[in-house]
Design a protein with these regions (language model features):
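Glycine-aromatic micro-motifs
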Residues: 1-166
């Protein structure tokens, strides 16, 4: 089974926290998708990554990494997120039937807290994503409303399912 990591889980530290035995297969992209940052629904306490495929994403590519993993992870639910299926075009020339998480109801455009955000540019650099793409993601981040408590600490060293524990 394949997971498409496009946001915080690009950082080796984060993917290992949530899927310790996941193995990277290839870098790739999801056509007509883009990485956005939004609050969850009506909440305004923080932003999260969102894997958008609305009209604004037409013609864009969300870059990421295909990870092979134990199927048990497909059953893991997190507050405010749903699993979605996506075809990923791998840099190895193959296509992959993947799944990933996205917000169920994206609210206003809002930045995530710093502890969360830092995994994104770190991961993109670890995977040698193009500087142009990294700058594009930075611009999306900069255009979003500030996180009310951007400096809040990571609430848990051990990931939980509830929004309060992440």
């Amino acid at each position: 089974m394949y997971y498409f990591g496009y946001c915080t889980w690009l950082d080796d530290v984060e993917i290992k926290r949530f899927m310790p035995a996941a193995t990277p297969v290839t870098k790739g992209y999801a056509a007509n998708h883009e990485l956005r940052f939004h609050a969850a629904g009506e909440r305004t306490d923080r932003g999260w990554c969102h894997f958008s495929n609305t009209a604004e994403a037409w013609g864009k590519k969300a870059l990421g990494v295909v990870f092979e993993h134990d199927p048990k992870h497909f059953e893991e639910d997190y507050d405010d997120f749903e699993r979605c299926c996506v075809t990923v075009y791998g840099d190895d020339g193959k296509t992959y039937d993947c799944w990933t998480y996205r917000l169920i109801t994206p609210g206003i455009a809002m930045r995530p807290p710093n502890f969360y955000w830092e995994h994104i540019p770190t991961g993109m650099k670890q995977w040698n994503f193009p500087e142009e793409y990294i700058a594009q993601v930075q611009a999306v981040f900069d255009a979003a409303a500030p996180c009310p408590r951007a400096d809040r600490p990571n609430p848990s060293a051990i990931p939980g399912r509830s929004a309060a524990s992440r």
